[in-house]
Each structure stands twice: as C-alpha cells, then as structure tokens.
Amino acid sequence: DPEQWWQATDRAMKALGDQHSLLDVKALGIAGQMHGATLLDAQQRVLRPAILWNDGRCAQECTLLEARVPQSRVITGNLMMPGFTAPKLLWVQRHEPEIFRQIDKVLLPKDYLRLRMTGAFASDMSDAAGTMWLDVAKRDWSDDMLQACHLSRDQMPALYEGSEITGALLPEVAKAWGMATVPVVAGGGDNAAGAVGVGMVDANQAMLSLGTSGVYFAVSEGFLSKPESAVHSFCHALPQRWHL
C-alpha cells in the first residue's frame, strides 16, 4: 500500500526532526527500490496495491512485449524480465481491465513519495531505465514501448537527470517536518544512488552490492548493452553516464 510508504516517510522525518533541527537542510534527494508499479487515477488516488520488483506474475507478458516490439532489446538495452515495470502494466491491462482504464499516471515507488512531497510527477533516468519504457541510449521515453502496453507519454512522469531539481517541498509538508520549502532533486534508483554515494561516478569504476538482490555495478560514459546475456543496461543517476 503506497499510503503506508508515505506514512512511514512522514514518521521518519518527524522522528529525525525530534533529534536534529532540519531548518539547515538545503535540499532533499530521493532514492528507492526500482521497477514497482504504482497506479494512480486522475484524482491522484492509488488504484490498487503496488506490484513490486520481485513479483513474477507477468512472464507471459514479457514474451508478448518482445513479440510486439521486435526491437525492444535494442531500445531498452535489456532482456524483458518479469521484474520490470512494463510487463506488470500489460498484466494489469489483460487481467484487471477495469483498473487499467482508470490509470492516469504510473509512478515508481520513490516517485510516489516525490508526488506527496512536491506535487510533481517526475522521475530520474536511472529509475526510469528500469521500466522498459525508456530508450536508454536517448534517455527519453520510447513511444513504441509505451504503445505496446497501451500507454502514452501523458501517463508517464517528466524525466530529469538525478542531480536536477524536480520541485520544492510543499508548504504543508515543510511545516509538518520543521523544514523550509527546500528543492527536491530527482535522485536515483537504489543501486545508482548507492553507487554515487560511494564514488562510482567515472567510467570503468565498479562495485558489488549485496542485499535482497545482488548487483555488480560497472559505470560507462556511453550506452553499452548485451541483452542476450541478461545483464541489465541502465542510465546512471548522473548526466552522460550509464551502467551495466
């Protein structure tokens, strides 16, 4: 339930404010788990529980999407997998059509929190690359991939580089957290943001991240892909950087 994410964020920020003054904070960035599908109607209401990255219900939809867009691996740089967002939406279209018809916006988990913080529909390149709707080389939405899921650009968030400002903290949120209406930057998917945090920002740098999933993360200055190997190819959370 995305509302529980927001309630947890609100509690955490208030608890932090009880320990330290947040008035000196100059900006906020957001990072979070990737690939999850958060579906909103035209009134910004959540339509159903989010379908998270580790939900494997949409294997058939992966096959269908690659058949509909034969160039999908070239566009996205990736082999279509059930963990990605696009096949999840095609599953909803096929199995929950009454829900699908009401979709006004599709957001990734961290970007739902951004909406609640700023009122803005926005995402960063690294997280968007994990949807399978992004042309990863061009760092832009792919109309072909969206149309294959019966979706359009209007239902997608605006795209930003990870270091760009996507909006400002809403006055009511800032007041509740004891903060100024500071800028909120795009941020990144969990692994891309973690890579920036430990200095993995230049070509040929690499790291190993172990957690709920295991990730070997290698930075490049250009788009590289080998989808037949099932190695992910995504945008990094910084401009003009990609990663495998």
Question: Language-model segments: what does each one mean?
Answer:
Residues 37-65, 102-103, 107-142, 185-244:
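Glycine-rich phosphate-binding loop of actin/hexokinase-like ATP-binding domains
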Residues 40-45, 66-75, 89-94, 240:
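Acidic/polar active-site rim loop that often engages polyanionic ligands
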Residues 12-19, 91, 95, 198:
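A generic secondary-structure signal
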Residues 72-189:
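Gly/Ser/Thr-rich active-site cleft segment
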Residues 1-20, 50, 54-78, 83:
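Phosphate-binding loop and its immediate beta->loop->alpha context
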Residues 1-48, 102, 157, 174-186:
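N-terminal glycine/serine-rich phosphate-binding loop of ATP-dependent small-molecule kinases
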Residues 1, 28, 55, 92, ...:
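Residue-level signal for inorganic ion chemistry
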Residues 31-35, 162-164, 210-213:
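Glycine-rich beta-strand-to-loop/alpha-helix junction loops that act as flexible
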